[in-house]
Amino acid sequence: ALANTNGLLALCRDGFTEDSPGGTVSLRSDGTATVDYPMTDTLRAGLRRGSLAMAELQFAAGAKEVRPHQLGQPWFTRWDAYKQAIQAMPIEKFQTRLGSAHVMGGCAMGSDPANAVADNNGRYMNLDRLSIMDGSLFPTSIGANPQLSIYGMVARLAAMLAAELKPLPVK
């Protein structure tokens, strides 16, 4: 029954090293977006470790059945059988459920328009009167539960912007 169902999520941080570059979003010739996320050996190892850690935790907590995130896999009733299967299981594109949590990055801050989208005050470099104030200003994900980091950055940027704004004349 649903009341006895549990799900876990393992976060793999990427974008910090050459062997774990993270994904890219680019535009096709017709203007639509395409996403590419390379399945590197480093990512595979992280997914395998995460799957094993989550299953071990679930079995230790009394789970009767645990199922891997890889498509087409059976339910397992014993930790040792699960561990053996995961260690042997290929982890390939379109066979492993991947998702994203705490999406951040994409609008890097900096002083050089060749390497940044926004200046150090969160202002978009290519359009006046547009500020970016959210997690997209981080270079990449900073890990789980980023709300305090985002709040702190946005509070600072918003206070700076508010101090610079001048009231519009009343008509």
Task: Give residue ranges: language-model regions.
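FAD-dependent oxidoreductase catalytic-site/capping-region signature
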Residues: 1-131, 136-138, 142-143, 149, ...
